[in-house]
Amino acid sequence: MITYADSADAITAGQLRGFFVGWPVAPSPERHLELLRASHAVEIALDGDVVVGFVTAISDGVLSAFIPLLEVLPAYQHRRIGTELVRRLLGQLDSLYMIDLCCDAELEPFYSALGFQTLDRGMGIRRRENV
């Protein structure tokens, strides 16, 4: 049975294996744990003591938030875990005016079903040496 947690305090780096599939340089489990704990808001999906998914938000806590990461382990995809993670995270961010994210075009229907709208523009910098 999948359970959910809104804190990474009880998570260890050893529980964070198999994420960041396809990334040219993946964060180490220790770095992954650091980003979970440093996020303004987090939701974590667990199958027993195995972390199978997570979503994070960074925010000013007043008006805006950005969702940089949503990941579900490949073996657990297509079970609505990602949907539940985002739904729970949006509940944590309910008082904010804007919640933004960037995603690949093929993921737009997933996020649209959760209430997100396509925005016209977005830009970014990727510094792989900092992963």
Task: Go through each PLM region and give its residues.
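Conserved acetyl-CoA-binding loop-helix of GNAT-fold acetyltransferases
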Residues: 72, 78-91
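Conserved beta-hairpin
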Residues: 35-55
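Conserved active-site alpha-helix within GNAT-family acetyltransferase domains
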Residues: 95-131
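Small/polar loops that bind or transfer phosphate-bearing groups
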Residues: 8, 68, 102-103
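Short amphipathic alpha-helix that is part of the acyltransferase structural core
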Residues: 1-30, 122
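A conserved beta-turn-beta hairpin within the catalytic core of GNAT-like acetyltransferases
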Residues: 58-67, 77
